[in-house]
């Protein structure tokens, strides 16, 4: 099968991009590619042949039909209007046409200078490229909407960050890279007709059922808000902190995008700050739901020229409804509840309070809870708590709640083990793979990618363990 590409963004949205070619790296070489995703997309294996050099994965060649552009957008960063931003080191190479008629963006990150690089060098480093590849694939296999990673190219190009590192490129795939910041850019340039063109593009290609409906814009924004609510609910249930929820890092399609200073919980800490540059804690874990709403309000403002205020407010209410409904459903599943009862939130919050006091490991606690037998007063989870009396009191109430369900242990445990992962991408696991890769050893990178494809499978090795001392509270920042 021949790959087919189109250039809808370039053809339909003039003045939203600059056309340019990638700038290859020195001695670029393919070090990893996503074999399963490549098979699903019918990408010929020959494209990954190392004897052909870095090829399209390193920006050295283009495939027929590709028409590369760097997109322009703006945004609020840490709550402050930052003005024009844009693809400062990424280039949208083209949009792959799939068999069902949909498309998939091929976006090369680290592809060199663009008109939107500002003070940057247009490069990505191996460290951050590996982190994004691991995070996006981990999220996908957890069932959370996300961009995908197709390939990583390493090089000998020196890149200066906090220390000198080496340049790399990531091929990132997504149904769309349309961001809240695209709309903000033209709204603040006082070009409302271009804001409406962006909305028309989104509806035409991603919500075509509404193209001829009079209230199409209001329906579309409601769905954007609902998708955002469901996404944030998913983050909160797995203990994921994005780290830099600027409006330019928010996807119109409700995808997790732009993995930078992210982190998954080790110990349960609702005030967890993944980004050591976030000195005020704006993007701490427990702030994510309110920040997403704030970001949606910024997007809503850009839509006021063609959506009534009442309709915008209804859509923002839809965000809250979607967030709370989806979060409640997911947390009941994590606890093994098939029905909703009035005291469920209190029971969950009591567990969270106990975990916070004890510094309990978030992922391991819920995974161990998945093995609970309602007739047994003992649990291996008990041994992880210092205050056994407090745990016993909670566990008795929990087992009593389980007995109100007409579900046997086997079925309940099966459900719980489908939503409570044994494996998440802890920062120390990513760092171990990065350290090895920077020394030229890619084995751990490949191994970790394989492990992350089965997050709901119990393991007895260190991929499911708490972090070693050196891996606790690793600091990550935006310097990618």
From Swiss-Prot:
Binding site for Mg(2+): 249, 258
Magnesium among keywords: yes
Molecular-function annotations in GO: AMPylase activity; ATP binding; magnesium ion binding
UniProt-annotated binding residues for ATP: 86, 88-89, 109, 121-122, 172, 179, 258
Keyword 4Fe-4S assigned: no
Cofactor(s), names only, from the UniProt record: Mg(2+); Mn(2+)
Transmembrane segments: none
Active site: residue positions: 248
Catalysed reaction, written as an equation: L-seryl-[protein] + ATP = 3-O-(5'-adenylyl)-L-seryl-[protein] + diphosphate; L-threonyl-[protein] + ATP = 3-O-(5'-adenylyl)-L-threonyl-[protein] + diphosphate; L-tyrosyl-[protein] + ATP = O-(5'-adenylyl)-L-tyrosyl-[protein] + diphosphate; L-histidyl-[protein] + UTP = N(tele)-(5'-uridylyl)-L-histidyl-[protein] + diphosphate
Keywords tagged on the record: ATP-binding, Magnesium, Manganese, Metal-binding, Nucleotide-binding, Nucleotidyltransferase, Transferase
Pfam families attached to this UniProt entry: SelO
InterPro entries per the UniProt record, alphabetical: adnlytase_SelO, SelO
EC number, UniProt record: 2.7.7.-, 2.7.7.108
Main enzyme class: transferase
PANTHER family listed in its UniProt record: PROTEIN ADENYLYLTRANSFERASE SELO, MITOCHONDRIAL (PTHR32057:SF14)
Family of the protein in this entry: Belongs to the SELO family.
Function text: Nucleotidyltransferase involved in the post-translational modification of proteins. It can catalyze the addition of adenosine monophosphate (AMP) or uridine monophosphate (UMP) to a protein, resulting in modifications known as AMPylation and UMPylation.
The protein, known as: Protein nucleotidyltransferase YdiU
